[in-house]
């Protein structure tokens, strides 16, 4: 604790003192609102909205709004917010992080600020870590919101645009961080504003905020399309990588050459998780691929592939960093142990691992849009979050997001005992001690949860435990399908559960077991849902429908479906049947000491260790935790220092004798702090680079939004034409000596859209009568004539539509290429550091130069497309295509330039009649009567009279 905190208290302490009087106000209002009828209580919502309209602030109405929500929760859900939960709600409303321990009811806490802020009508986003929690909370808490007159939406995978739009239009919207982020990116790829789904970013409440804003911060959201076919170079380089000898060091010393530190062909730096070719490896590469110099510019692609291949072999470990399942390489989340379906390593690393594992190497992808969670969530006017473990990352939350942490007291005193670390000389000695402790707990009827850091280590421990008992469950990325069931029952008497990292599991471990899961297990056993869905042949019931019905058995959503109601009735019957036995068992487990948590290794982050400990001792229950460590653990070996090892040797301890030493524990915590600091710097560095892209992204998306908002951009298109012509004339007609002017290059540049082969065939005698400005004016006037002729032909509304389409398509295509170019720039920019230049500054300077070039390309491409496109077939207004398809689809290049064969001027226009309920030919997918084309052309769409 700092001197300032000792004198004045921490931010959290000061905030709690400020909040306590407000909490008392809310509690004092309980009798007032408890006396109201349901109708009178529900009438408070429109009354609050009116008060806001009359000039009151949210802070003014906070005590009353919280008191109303609290009373409504009691009437609708049978739950009433405790004083500490009101404290958490106030912290969230103020834009802070409420640090609340596991089991303290964070889901209910969020209803207070969500209800209050939803009264503004701007929308509240409640962000969860998975679809299950989003659905559960939206249904469960949705009953409360709807009773109070607010609408609730849910964003889930597989929903179409209309459903998403409706969900975002609701007062309160639940969804995962991924869904919110991807919807933002997709909204900035649409061609019509009506296709956007989000309506702004006013207020977000982020559940498990540390997981989303810290752990996920280095992983950008990427929408990608199909790129080039996967290069055969991956397999060639993989064959080469298999011939190399690996050398491993704890940490490479910067000032000592790689070759002096390693005798292999490449060296692996364990501490920093990097791989580097040695001189021997470089020679082998040059010989294998028959090249003279691997470092030459023409061999950059090959060198990059080799770097990724040796990283795949030297750093990336199967069943730790990834698993191979059904012929696919699937990333394992290092923080939660979950499989990350749909995620891929970037820069060719994923393909290198696929080649290493002998599975199909997937084709490369092209990035269409991207953003980091850091920059997405910083867009919200007000951001808040909840978690059980935020204090260790306080600096990052404050520096990056401007979020302060308020540690909310528990409702009941914590009874968990955290024992000192038990440290062993070897991993085997540690595992034997763990097994001994597990068996002792099991014998006493005490449930035990063993946390491991990888799939591989969980399976190693399971094999050792099998020699003594088979009565245990293993939860890792390979069998995550039973995750909720295993976690829910981990608190039963004598239960043994071995699991990879428990962060963000989302299901509370209840002592005595979980009644709901027992009820569902019985429903499965008796095939209740199958009999409902297919009474005559239960075995023929659709498995997907069975699972959906089972999920609804304990759902909270309103329904009139007879099957769902029957399933809920059966669920309630079983719930009531099992509850007494579970409560009795829970008392036995409490008497045995509650849940015992065993950590088998320290994580790089203290926060993940704290999350594991936090699974025990929920809501004042007893519990215990202890970490079993060894000198051979990665963290101890890489960061513990030699003094720990020498201490063990001095004490002459065998591998089965533990030591509880504060010095060793302090050394470990110091190492963890260093690692946390280093990882923070990495995330901060990622943000520095993404901030450059973010500034550019905001400019591009801002311009897109103006176009989508329906602004008339005809004047802007004319200015773009003028600027493009002036720029080209300055380039090709540079200087005052007309003999040096490159008329041929200017003619070729505009050939087919502004010039003909006959243009600019000047002789020296003509030079006195021409000027750069005159040529530019001639080209501009010619372009304007073409545009004016098109406007007469198609009509002003359709011409405005064409201008929008052309600009949006060119912006999107150039932006996609720019993302790739910036990515390539970033990959190579780090080398500037060797030249005493700041890579971030260099990236910013060159990035904005590239951005200016992109803007020039957008300008030229847009006016060129507008000048040359022609509607090709009857009724074909500009086709509303998906972004990233080949530009110009639905159009043929024409050209209205004088002397160039194209569509004749003055051609009669024919109108094609379209039925009101027919699909609009523009490709929007809407019926004619609902499409904007009907508003522009109520009589039908114009087309050439001579077209079929």
Predicted stretch roles:
Residues 450, 498, 815, 851, ...:
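Hydrophobic, well-ordered secondary-structure elements that form the walls
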Residues 1-630, 634-647, 652, 702, ...:
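Conserved P-loop NTPase motor core
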Residues 445-458, 709-710, 738, 764-768, ...:
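Short, Lys/Glu-rich amphipathic helical modules
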Residues 33, 322-330, 336-344, 589-590, ...:
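Extended, charged helical/alpha-beta scaffold domains that provide interaction surfaces
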Residues 219, 448, 505, 815, ...:
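Glycine-centered loop/turn positions within well-structured domains
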């Amino acid at each position: 604790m700092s001197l300032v905190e000792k004198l004045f208290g921490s931010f959290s302490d000061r905030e709690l003192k400020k909040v306590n009087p407000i909490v008392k106000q809310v509690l004092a209002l309980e009798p007032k609102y408890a006396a109201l009828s349901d109708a009178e209580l529900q009438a408070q919502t429109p009354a609050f909205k009116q008060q806001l309209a009359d000039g009151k602030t949210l802070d003014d109405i906070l005590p009353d709004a919280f008191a109303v929500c609290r009373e409504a929760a009691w009437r609708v859900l049978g739950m009433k917010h405790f004083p500490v939960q009101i404290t958490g709600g106030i912290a969230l409303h103020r834009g802070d992080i409420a640090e609340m321990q596991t089991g303290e009811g964070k889901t209910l806490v969020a209803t207070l600020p969500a209800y209050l802020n939803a009264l503004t009508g701007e929308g509240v986003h409640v962000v969860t870590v998975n679809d299950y929690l989003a659905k559960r909370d939206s249904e469960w808490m949705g009953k409360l919101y709807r009773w109070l007159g607010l609408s609730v939406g849910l964003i889930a995978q597989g929903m179409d645009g209309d459903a998403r739009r409706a969900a975002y239009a609701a007062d309160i919207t639940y969804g995962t961080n991924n869904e919110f982020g991807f919807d933002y990116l997709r909204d900035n790829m649409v061609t019509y504003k009506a296709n956007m789904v989000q309506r702004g970013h006013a207020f977000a409440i982020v559940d498990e905020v540390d997981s989303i804003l810290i752990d996920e911060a280095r992983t950008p959201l990427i929408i990608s399309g199909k790129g080039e076919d996967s290069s055969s170079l991956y397999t060639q380089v993989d064959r080469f990588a298999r011939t190399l000898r690996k050398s491993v060091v704890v940490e490479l010393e910067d000032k000592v050459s790689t070759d002096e530190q390693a005798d292999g062909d490449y060296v692996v730096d364990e501490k920093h998780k990097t791989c580097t070719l040695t001189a021997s490896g470089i020679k082998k590469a040059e010989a294998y691929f028959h090249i003279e110099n691997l470092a030459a510019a023409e061999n950059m692609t090959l060198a990059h592939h080799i770097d990724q291949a040796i990283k795949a072999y030297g750093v990336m470990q199967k069943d730790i960093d990834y698993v191979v399942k059904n012929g696919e390489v699937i990333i394992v989340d290092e923080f939660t142990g979950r499989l990350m379906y749909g995620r891929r390593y970037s820069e060719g690393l994923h393909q290198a691992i696929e080649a290493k594992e002998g599975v199909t190497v997937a084709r490369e992808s092209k990035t269409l849009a991207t953003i980091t969670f850091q920059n997405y969530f910083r867009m919200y006017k007000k951001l808040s979050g909840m978690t059980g473990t935020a204090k260790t990352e306080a600096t990052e939350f404050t520096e990056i997001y401007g979020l302060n942490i308020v540690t909310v007291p528990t409702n009941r005193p914590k009874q968990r005992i955290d024992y000192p670390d038990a440290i062993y000389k070897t991993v085997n000695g540690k595992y034997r001690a763990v097994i001994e402790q597990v068996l002792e707990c099991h014998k006493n009827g005490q449930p035990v949860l063993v946390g491991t850091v990888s799939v591989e280590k969980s399976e190693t421990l399971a094999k050792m435990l099998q020699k003594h008992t088979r009565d245990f469950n293993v939860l890792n990325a390979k069998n995550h399908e039973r995750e909720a069931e295993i976690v829910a029952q981990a608190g039963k008497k004598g239960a043994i559960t071995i699991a990879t990292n428990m962060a963000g599991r989302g299901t509370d471990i209840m002592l005595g077991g979980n009644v709901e899961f027992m009820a569902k297990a019985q429903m499965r056993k008796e095939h209740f849902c199958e009999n409902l869905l297919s009474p005559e042949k239960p075995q023929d019931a659709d498995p997907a429908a069975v699972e959906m019905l089972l999920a609804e058995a304990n759902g909270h959503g309103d329904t009139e479906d007879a099957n769902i109601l029957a399933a809920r009735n059966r669920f309630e019957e079983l719930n009531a049947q099992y509850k007494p036995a579970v409560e009795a068992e829970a008392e036995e487990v409490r008497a045995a000491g509650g849940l015992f948590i065993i950590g088998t290794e320290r994580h790089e982050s203290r926060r993940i260790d704290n999350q594991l400990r936090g699974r025990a001792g929920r809501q004042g229950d007893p519990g215990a935790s202890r970490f079993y460590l060894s000198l051979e653990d990665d963290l101890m070996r890489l960061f513990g220092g030699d003094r720990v090892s020498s201490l063990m040797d001095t004490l002459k301890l065998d591998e089965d004798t533990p030591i509880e030493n504060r010095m060793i524990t302090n050394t470990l915590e110091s190492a963890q702090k260093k690692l946390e600091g280093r990882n923070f710097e990495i995330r901060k560095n990622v943000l520095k680079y993404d901030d450059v892209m973010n500034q550019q992204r905001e400019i591009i998306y801002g311009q897109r939004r103006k176009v989508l908002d329906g602004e008339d951009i005809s004047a802007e298109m004319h200015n773009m034409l003028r600027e493009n012509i002036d720029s080209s004339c300055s380039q090709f007609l540079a200087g005052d000596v007309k003999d040096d002017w490159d008329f041929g290059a200017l003619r070729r540049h505009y050939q087919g859209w502004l010039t003909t082969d006959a243009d600019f065939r000047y002789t020296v005698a003509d030079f006195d009568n021409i000027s750069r400005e005159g040529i530019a004016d001639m080209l501009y006037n010619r372009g304007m004539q073409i545009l004016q002729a098109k406007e007469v032909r198609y009509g002003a509304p359709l011409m405005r539509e064409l201008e929008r389409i052309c600009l949006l398509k060119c912006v999107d295509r150039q932006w996609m290429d720019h993302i790739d170019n910036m990515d390539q720039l970033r990959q190579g920019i780090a080398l500037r550091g060797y030249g005493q230049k700041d890579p971030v500054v260099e990236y910013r300077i060159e990035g904005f130069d590239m951005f200016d070039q992109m803007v020039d390309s957008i300008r030229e491409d847009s006016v060129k497309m507008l000048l040359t496109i022609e509607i090709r077939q009857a009724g074909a207004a500009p086709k509303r295509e998906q972004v990233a398809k080949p530009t110009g689809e639905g159009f043929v290049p024409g050209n209205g330039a004088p002397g160039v064969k194209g569509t004749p001027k003055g051609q009669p226009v024919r109108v094609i009649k379209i039925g009101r309920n027919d699909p609009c030919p523009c490709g929007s997918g809407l019926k004619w009567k609902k499409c904007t084309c009907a508003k522009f052309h109520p009589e039908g769409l114009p087309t050439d009279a001579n077209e079929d």
